[in-house]
């Protein structure tokens, strides 16, 4: 729904060698200037796949584990033991994932702990929190092991 969030998520995916799967309807064009601006110059680093619906995604990746981010979940995102290839599923910012999608998958629904008074987090922030927890558990595969310290003159 919000082009800037999608751009931020694309940048996160680019920086971590993650594929970004988008499910139609998107509500904006992937070429939207706000999407492009938020993703900066990282677009060549991210594999973006657009699917007509969630069933198309399931059909293309039938052997993957899917985790559904929802404020309604009983399990937190850090209780899961993530594996390479796991799929993290998020809904639109304004309404989250539909109840019909969550029926029957309650054990794979995850949430980020927060105070009762808050409805939800910004979508791109939630994606980053959960994605980095998964990466942390997997010991940050394929990512840079050390930073580049500024050398004194």
Where are these regions (language model features)?
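Post-transcriptional modification and biogenesis factors for structured RNAs
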Residues: 1-153
